[in-house]
């Protein structure tokens, strides 16, 4: 009825988050697929999910009985979304609608370039329909708003003022005056604040505008946000007015197209001429990765204390199943989380635990079901992929352990994976070696087998 030939939905949010809140799990709501990587294309006669090797088995199971077809990515003969759209529609232009709030500028430009190549420069149109599912998703969750928790400099090793001053100096060195920050982890780092707006991630859903004169934090429920010294809180939904009000003090504005969503980008272009909009990689990314002494101490503490919880868990599960207890994968996952929760400063898990036994342990990114998960037996292999969020650090640890006698194939695969990991850990690479070369070396002992994951 709107003249669209196709709708493209992604599994991200307005901040290009890897883990979106429940409100923006559009792919899951539409298809039932719960994997972290997936794009959906809907046309008048077709619905398809594009995902990679990590989720082929999961997607096949979850899409069974639906009208959604699985399209496999990162395999020989793959047909990407733009090429598929071009071949599916004979008439041109192809009219494609996207939710501009959940598509980064970089993603839309990649789509435009691919469509231009597949359909010709005049063979397509892309429409921005922000929150397009709002009218159909009756019980759609609201944008979350959790309490904001400022972090003391004793925990992070730097004050908020020091980090903002560093950013302003960095912007000046790069020929810019201001920056519009959209990635939630970067905002949390710059302001030394934490929240619980997204499961497993201690973030506050917000935007941040840093100019030479002011720092404006666009958040939900402004009146409930505690005062943050040196920061002015503004409403999350009034970006348009704020850009106009601060135009005079902003000057040359740096934006990162990999995290800036397309819809907000168009708002910026409405208020700032192209000459004043500078595209580039956020300087916060690298600076945030270089840990100061206090942060290093925090990470070491996190892994030590979380390691004790993990060792306690592994002892518990081994003695429990060998003692005849009926322990399911889900129950084991809950036990691991409970042991971690005892640690002072724990903010919960850093991602959904992967608790997998037997054949399930071989599945890339297995999702442990609450109901009907496998019973763990005193034989074969058990995998636990788990991590925690603490006020002083974040952990992520994977362990595959034999719980008793293993099959010949299990012993061979376990040994080859271990040898590959040892080989990789001892190897010396020239500076600048691509990450895919590491994968080639680590998997060299697999005798031609293909695992399709990264959790060896």
Regions inferred by a protein language model and the residue ranges of each:
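Active-site neighborhoods and metal-handling regions in enzymes and metal-associated proteins
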Residues: 1-456
């Amino acid at each position: 009825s709107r003249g669209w030939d196709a709708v493209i939905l992604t599994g991200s949010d307005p901040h290009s988050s890897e883990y979106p809140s429940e409100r923006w799990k559009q792919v899951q709501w539409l298809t039932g697929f719960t994997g972290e990587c997936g794009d959906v294309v809907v046309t008048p006669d077709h619905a398809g999910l594009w995902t990679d090797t990590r989720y082929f088995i999961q997607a096949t199971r979850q899409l069974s009985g639906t009208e959604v077809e699985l399209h496999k990515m990162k395999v020989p003969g793959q047909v990407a979304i733009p090429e598929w759209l071009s071949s599916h529609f004979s008439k041109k232009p192809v009219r494609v609608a996207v939710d501009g709030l959940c598509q980064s500028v970089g993603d839309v430009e990649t789509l435009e370039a691919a469509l231009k190549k597949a359909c010709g420069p005049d063979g397509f149109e892309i429409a921005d329909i922000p929150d397009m599912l709002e009218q159909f998703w009756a019980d759609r969750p609201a944008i979350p708003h959790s309490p904001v928790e400022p972090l003391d400099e004793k925990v992070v090793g730097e004050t908020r003022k020091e980090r903002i001053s560093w950013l302003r100096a960095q912007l000046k060195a790069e020929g810019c005056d201001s920056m519009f920050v959209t990635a939630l982890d970067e905002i949390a780092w710059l302001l030394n604040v934490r929240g619980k707006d997204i499961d497993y991630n201690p973030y506050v859903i917000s935007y941040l505008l840093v100019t030479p004169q002011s720092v404006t934090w666009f958040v939900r429920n402004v009146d409930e946000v505690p005062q943050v010294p040196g920061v002015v809180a503004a409403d999350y939904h009034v970006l348009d007015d704020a850009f106009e009000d601060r135009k005079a003090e902003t000057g040359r504005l740096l934006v990162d197209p990999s995290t800036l969503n397309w819809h907000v980008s168009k708002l910026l272009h409405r208020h700032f001429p192209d000459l004043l909009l500078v595209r580039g990689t956020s300087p916060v990314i690298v600076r945030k990765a270089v840990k100061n002494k206090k942060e290093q101490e925090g990470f070491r503490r996190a892994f030590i204390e979380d390691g004790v919880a993990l060792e306690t868990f592994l002892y518990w599960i081994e003695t429990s199943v060998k003692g005849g207890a009926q322990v399911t994968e889900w129950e084991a996952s809950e036990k691991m989380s409970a042991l971690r929760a005892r640690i002072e400063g724990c903010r919960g898990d850093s991602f959904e635990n992967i608790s997998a036994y037997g054949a399930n342990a071989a599945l890339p990114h297995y999702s442990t079901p609450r109901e009907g998960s496998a019973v763990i037996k005193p034989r074969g292999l058990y995998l636990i992929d788990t991590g925690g969020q603490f006020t002083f650090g974040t952990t992520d640890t994977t362990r595959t352990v034999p719980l008793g006698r293993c099959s010949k194939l299990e012993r061979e695969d376990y040994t080859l994976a271990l040898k590959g990991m040892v080989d990789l850990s001892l190897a010396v690479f020239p500076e600048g070696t691509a990450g895919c070369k590491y994968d080639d070396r680590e998997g060299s002992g697999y005798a031609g087998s293909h695992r399709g994951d990264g959790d060896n």
